[in-house]
Structure formats: C-alpha cells, structure tokens
Amino acid sequence: MADSNDTALEPFGSVQRTHIGREASEPMREDIRLLGAILGDTVREQNGEEVFDLVERARVESFRVRRSEIDRSELADMFSGVDAHQAIPVIRAFTHFALLANVAEDIHRERRRAVHVAAGKPPQDSSLAATYRKLDAADLDVDKVADTLTGALVSPVITAHPTETRRRTVFDTQHRITELMRLRLHGHTRTDDNRDIETELRRHILTLWQTALIRLSRLKISDEIETGLRYYEAAFFDVIPQVNAEVRDALRKRWPDAKLLEEPILRPGSWIGGDRDGNPNVTPEVVRHATGRAAYVALAHYFEQITALEQELSMSARLVKVTPALAALADACHEPARADEPYRRALRVIHARLTSTAREILDEQPEHGLDLGLPRYQTPAEFLADLDAVDGSLRANGSRVLADDRLGRLREAVRVFGFHLSGLDMRQNSDVHEEVVAELLAWAGVHPDYTSLSEPQRVELLAAEIATRRPLIREGAELSELAQKELGIVAAAARAVKVFGPQAVPNYIISMCQSVSDMLEAAVLLKEAGLLDISGSTPYAPVGVVPLFETIDDLQRGSSILEAALDLPEYRTMVDARDGHQEVMLGYSDSNKDGGYLAANWALYRAELDLVESARKTGIRLRLFHGRGGTVGRGGGPSYDAILAQPPGAVKGSLRITEQGEVIAAKYAEPRIAHRNLETLLAATLEASLLDVEGLGEEAEPAYQVLDELAALAQRAYSELVHETPGFVEYFKTSTPVSEIGALNIGSRPTSRKPTTSIADLRAIPWVLAWSQSRVMLPGWYGTGSAFENWIGTDPDGARLRVLQDLYARWPFFRTVLSNMAQVLAKADMGLAARYSELVEDADLRARVFDKIVAEHDRTIRMHRLITGQDDLLADNAALARSVFNRFPYLEPLNHLQVELLRRYRSGETDELVQRGILLTMSGLATALRNSG
C-alpha cells in the first residue's frame, strides 16, 4: 500500500507549509512504507488482485485529492454503488494501515528521544529529568515542598469508551508487531530466537488481517472491564511501581528531611463497572464482578512474582546470614524440603498465606496456589511486612542488588495495587439519587413528599439523617426496582471495601450536581450501606462524596455549593474523617456541549480559581478530578500543557484525570510509551504544584476580564448555532453517524441519558465522536473565531489584537487553548464535511447550518493566524504535523465509504455487511485519529 518512491507525503491542506523536518522523519516514513507494503502484499494474496487494485486505486486517488490534482467527487464516485463484499476489505485495509501507522509513530517517538539523549542535549520538557532541573533552580523551601506534597496523588482513571472496540487478539498482535519494529529500530534483522524480522512481520500482519477487528455483538460491561484490565499486564505492573520509586527517590534525595511521598503518588483508578450514570446495565452483580476481577488480576500478578522469587532466591544458610525476622518467617514453613534455604522457605510461607487470602476474598482462584494451612493476610500491609522482612535481610547481608530487583518491584507494586488493584469510582446522576432518597424517606415515615421541599428544608432533613446511625430501611422492605438496584449497588461497593480494603471504592461521584442536597443524598445512600457513620466519636467515611459540576452554570456556582456543604457540621465531619480531603470533579464534556469550546474552557478555569479560594477559606485539602476525554472538545490535548495551564493552587500535588478509549491504547499499551506518558503526568503535576507557571503576576485580573468577555461572546455564537438554529438537531442526526453509534452495538451504554432528541440529554461521547467521524470537529473550535473577531472589533490602532497576542505569548492557559484548537482545526476537513452534509435531505436546512459552520471555520483559522502570528496551524507541533501528513490521505477512503454506507443503511439496506462496514469505518477513523471521542 506504499510505493518505495511514494511522494504522497507531500504537504496538503491548511497546514501544508509546516516544516516537519523531512530528514528527521524519514526513518518513520521508511517504517510506514515497509508496513504498508507488507499489508498490500497480504491484501493481494488473501483477497485477490481485484480488491488490491481497488485499495491501491483509492490510495492513489486520495493522495491526488490532497494535492488538488482531482476533485474529491471523483473519489466519491469510485465508491458510489460499490458492492458491500468489496467495500469491507477496502475498509479493513485502510483501518489496518492506520493501526500500523500508529505503531510506526510510536517507534519514531522512541527514536527521536534516543537521538535527543545521544546528542547530549538537555532533557526534553515534560520529562522528569527536566522537571528536576527546574525544581533545583527554584531553590524551594523544604516546608513548602512538604506541605504541598502531603497526600500527593496522580491518578489516571480508566473509563469505558465506545470507540475502543478492538479485541484482545488484535491488541496482542499489534503489541508483537511493535516489538518487532523496536528490534529493527535497534539495528537487528533477526529476533532473539533467530527468526527473520521481516518474515515475522509478514506472519503477524497476516494474522492481523485474518482476525476480526471488532466484536459484532454489543459490548457487555464485562468486555469493557477486561479491556481496562489488560493494560496492567501490558504496562502498568511494570511501569507504575518503577515510576513511583524513581520519583520518590529523586525528591527525597533533594529534600531528605521532608518524609516525602510516604504513599505512592501514582495510583490508577477505574470507572468501568461503577459508572452507572445513564447505564442501566450496571448492577450489583457488575460491581461485584468489576471489583473481584480487579482483585484477581492483582493477586495473580503477586503469585507470578512470588513463584519467580522462589526460583531466584536460592541462597544457602551455609553461605549467607539472615536477620531474625527472616529466620522467624522461614521457621513458619514446616515443609521438610529446602531446610538449608531460608529465603525460599520464607517465600513459601508468603506464598501459602497469599493462597489463603485468595481463597477467602476471590470467587476465582489464580494459578500457582500453595496450601500449607497458614492463615490469610488480613491487609496488604501484612503482606508487605513479610516482603519487607525478606528485603531487610537481603540488604543487611550484602545482597542489595537482589533486593532492588524483582523483590523491590513487587514491594512497590503491593504499595500501589494492594488487594484491590485500582480504585473503582461509583457514579450516578443526581436525579436518580433524589428519586431513590425520596422513596426511602417516605417508606421510613420520615417525610411523605421529599421532592416538594425547598432546598433549605431538604438540607436540614438530610443532615439530620446523616447524623443518626439509624438506617431508613430494614431488610425485606418492599421498594421499587430502581431503589432496590441502587441500594444493591452501594451494598456491593460496601462489600468491596470490606473485602479488598478501603481503596477499592474511594469515591462516590454525583453527576449533574447542582446543590448541597445533591451531595447529601449520596451521603444518605452511603450511610444506608454502612459506608458512612458520623454518629460516634470516631467518624467513619471511607468513600468520599465527590460533586461533579458539568454545565457552565454549575461550574460557576460550584464553589458556593461546596462552601455551603462545608458549613454544615455533618458534612464537615465527613470531610475531616478523610483527613480534610475533598475531591471535586469538573466536567469538560458536558460544559463544552452546553456552551462551546472557549466558554467551557474559561468556565473551568474560573471554577478552579473559585474552588481553590474556597479550599483556602475553609481549610480543606482540595483535589480536582478532571473529566477530560480524548478530544479537545472533551478537554483533551497534551497532558503536560493542560496541567501547566491550570490556575495557581489548583494542582497542589494532586490531580485525577480520566483516560478513555483509543487514547488509553495510545498512551498505555506499551511499557516504554506508558512510562513516558506517566512521567509526563508526574512532571507536570510537580511543576504546577511547586513552581509559578501562570506567569501573569499582577496582570492576572485584567487578563481574566478579557477572557470573561471572550467567553461570553463565544458562548453566544455557539448557542446561536446549537441551541437556537431551527432544525439543528435534525441536521446533526442526519449529517453524522450519531444515530448509528447507538444502533450498531458500540459500547455498553446508551448514547443518551434519557429517551429524548435533546442535545442536552445526549451523552458527550457520541456528540463528539459523531462530529469527529464527519470531520467537522465542531466541539473543539466553534464560536471561538466569532468571539475573537467581535472582541477585536474595528480596533483602528490594533490595541486589542496586541492584548491577545501578549496573552498568547505569556499565559500558558491561553496558549494551550489556542494550541489545542489548532490541532482540531488541522484534523477538520470542510470538504469531507460537505459530503456528510449531503446526507441531509432538506436542502434549506443543509445550507442554513453547513454554511454557518464553514464560515465560522474559516473565521477561526483567520483569527488563530492573527493572534499567534503563525500561518500554519501546526507550526508548534511537528509530531502532529508528521502524523497528519503521513496518515490523513488514508482516512479519505474511510470517510467516503462511511457516507456511502450510511446512505444505504438509512434507505433501508440494513443487511449485515452494510452494518459491519459502518462499524468498521467508525473503528478505522477512531484508530487513525487516535482521539476521536
């Protein structure tokens, strides 16, 4: 699929003059050519010359379109009426190419970093090495460092996503191809077992071609749970303990008296199986399965490592000394064998106790169990104490190098993963809480009509309920199906906390939180399940209540809601029971859908400023949880820049951030790439916490005023299109594949929270995914161009433009907003979007909406150039520029085929091949864009 002299990577589109360093990128281009050629050979061998010729013709014509040599309609005509049997392999070919291009890009990142290091250049920004240099230069006060990093936590939270539809087999095969390309990177022509690398590539690409890329049945939550868990074996078990140890050691070396990071700073989380907001498929059984499978994966890893250590630590008592603690541990092993091998005997004891633990807490037993009749570990701390005894003995007797190896990694892993693996958040919509709590209060005779009460009355009633130990419901109470289900889910969470430890379910998130009573309703449900008790002298609150502010209005009121809750003695007691920590989640997705890109970003920034001030006034330790999606329209973009763009005081050593779908695969599917991405999260967190990165000083308030005005203008322009244009919902539903996202078994969750046609009720993921597939990318830019143009106005002396140019140069937040927007604009394609608009049968509606979109798109690019001084959208992002050049012509056929198949599907041609083709195009585009939803 790629000629040896392929000139198709020449510049195109709105970013065509970007200099991407042709010499620097040539090795990647060679990798892409190699993989593309092997794929082309595979297509020809497996599907014949006719299919190969169609694929190759589509590829060549796509490049000709990009060079403006032919009109796009000629490519569209090629696929008009194409037989579905032929369309499927064409779609698969371009989808596979996108997947292989991802491999080549990932390998090239490693190559560029290696070149950078070999050249002796300073560490790259976003690396921990660069961050340590900045911290050293800042000459920080040790007390400030210690206070800031108290309770530090950086937590990537894995969430389910409808575009991550790849099967485990595909995931594993891609991993093997990556390993082979990595060997080539280091100059090898043969594998470790003497196999020819190119032959192996052909074998694995053939396997990939013959493997179904996607599931044809609707994803079950159990499938999504397994998808999330696979990243632990793939990368997290190796990388997270390693990075935690590296950061802890580096910081303690700089500030040895500060006792920094006594708990691991990097701890993963998950929503999969606990997020029931709008997902009726989450049940008590699902929560139990999610927490149980997570614990299984953790303990299976420990068994594997303990078994390996038993083989490795074979030292004889005749040759080495041991500590009394190790000797006592070994003496608990009564097996007659290995009498002269104290470390092996000690590890057998650990192995046996871990087996007893697994048998008591797991429904499914891992391999490598050992039954010696020894008692279980009651807590991970007990398990760790025995490992520490082995470690201490090794270090005390000249074997530090052994202690630092597998045993050291295992000890770090236990600190992070415990028996729970990752914390599973519970999430539910506030409307559901209100309905259930109203039923419980009525059943218990506390109040017959809770929903009729005013907000102050609700707060008074709920606070009183929280303060008492008495439950509202007795066993066997006759409740509605909804109430039984909700109470059952919280009870399943309580079981997980009891069985796997308090970190198993750390948070209860309230979606669409709009009041103090919304927070207290969740607390009442926690109390019913035994997860909250503030009635005695020792308050118990293992699960934090986390308000999620999602709309722009709620973001603006979030700090006042939080302060009002903290004014209540009952709620303050709950927070104090959690060492004064209060988490607040910020919704990037719904705020963007509500008010548009610029207004949402500014509302989030303002909300953070206000919440930081509220935390200062009330004396709590605030942790912000950023509900970011993969796309810019859902808060995505480079993590390092995004974290540094946070307002002063908003990070303070801690943040959590959602990771979703194909973005998870892009960041965490490989240990080396995972290490780099996790390192980036930590580097940005440390810099944002300990350094002054905002850079505005006394000019902050004038800058904030400018953004207040710009955000209002942007929201006005966005609302005029999305919320006020007659027929807009119809245009959206017919010009994008949003309806098919729900109909074609993508993801376990419905596309809307409620069965309505309202944009407000539509979930943010399908909203953004649909616009991404149709190449409009509207959520990532619309309204911003109008805001800038209107704010600058006539401005005869250019003063206002200079204000914006100065903010771009000095303020990380503003620069990041424009940089992320530029990435979206570079991926948008109004020519392809026009093809999708043709799916709208009402010509007047089509013209009315699409003309507005095109005009705003052009306006936004023009304003970006004025403010940044850059003619090219990707002038400051060479890596993305390379990606755009290398892969976007290969997306063109996928878009044209998607439009063709959507037209057929909607006209009644609903056979299985057409449906599968649409699903495959969605998967292919998501794979190629890498952050589509």
Curated annotation (Swiss-Prot):
Active site: H161, K593
Gene Ontology MF term list: magnesium ion binding; phosphoenolpyruvate carboxylase activity
Domain of life: Bacteria
Entry EC no(s): 4.1.1.31
Record flagged with keyword Magnesium: yes
Family to which the UniProt record says this protein belongs: Belongs to the PEPCase type 1 family.
Name of protein: Phosphoenolpyruvate carboxylase
Organism: Mycolicibacterium smegmatis (strain ATCC 700084 / mc(2)155)
